[in-house]
From Swiss-Prot:
Residue stretches making up the Guanylate kinase-like domain: 3-181
Organism phylogeny: Bacteria, Pseudomonadati, Pseudomonadota, Gammaproteobacteria, Lysobacterales
Keyword check for ATP-binding: yes
Protein name, per record: Guanylate kinase
Encoding gene, per UniProt annotation: gmk
Subcellular location: Cytoplasm
Chemical reaction(s) catalysed: GMP + ATP = GDP + ADP
Molecular functions per Gene Ontology: ATP binding; guanylate kinase activity
The species this protein was found in: Xylella fastidiosa (strain Temecula1 / ATCC 700964)
Similarity section: Belongs to the guanylate kinase family.
Cysteine-cysteine disulfides: none
Length: 204
């Protein structure tokens, strides 16, 4: 049975990575695909754990070689998912989660229409700004740029299957877990997973 592809998107400061990491700690059936990026690592980030950090030239070489499943220019830096991180895993029946922006999500849906997509929104603009400032990673100028970009990014929430409002962290994690559980209970999934049982039950 082919694996399920999940897409999770949000604007900066929404808590996307924290929600994804907490959810995947509880759900060992889904593998997080680590993205490539041309930006510099932040102090708490590690190569091959948070991102694969490469130069802009190397990223362009990978684009030209057709190595990416999806890629986009985000806040002035390139981000992308390698084909090798997704296609073999899905073919082997493993579920894969992509933590990408709306541009990449649109590319993925054009290739895999049955991918399940989730967009995370903040409870308010004030909360989003507060979270960006609490990170302590960006200058005032960068914070203003990210807030301006967030408005454009959030406008694409209606392109996704599910919307989670991250007002209370544990609630948001539970809601994401519920989406994963529900997707496994879909008729088309259960029909394949329990084919022998269903055939036995329906045989006169």
């Amino acid at each position: 049975m082919r694996g399920t592809l999940y897409i999770v998107s949000a604007s900066s400061g929404t808590g996307k990575s924290s929600i994804v990491n907490a959810t995947l700690e509880r759900d060992q059936q889904i593998a997080l695909s680590i993205s490539f990026t041309s930006r510099q690592p932040r102090p708490n980030e590690r190569h091959a754990q948070h991102y694969y950090f490469v130069s802009a030239d190397e990223f362009q070489r990978m684009i030209e070689a057709g190595d990416f499943f999806e890629y986009a220019l985000v806040h002035g830096d390139w981000k992308g998912t390698a084909r090798q991180s997704v296609e073999p895993q899905l073919a082997a029946g493993h579920d894969v989660l992509l933590e990408i922006d709306w541009q990449g999500a649109r590319q993925v849906r054009s290739k895999i229409p049955d991918a399940i997509s989730i967009f995370i929104l903040p409870p308010s603009r004030a909360a989003l700004e507060e979270r960006l400032r609490k990170r302590g990673q960006d200058s005032e100028e960068v914070i203003h740029l990210r807030l301006a970009a967030a408005h454009e990014e959030m406008a694409h929430y209606d392109e996704f299957d599910y919307t989670i409002i991250n007002e209370h962290f544990e609630t948001a994690v539970s809601e994401m877990s519920a989406i994963f559980t529900a997707s496994r209970l879909r008729r088309q999934t259960q029909k394949i997973r329990h084919a022998n049982l269903i055939q036995t039950l329906l045989t006169p």
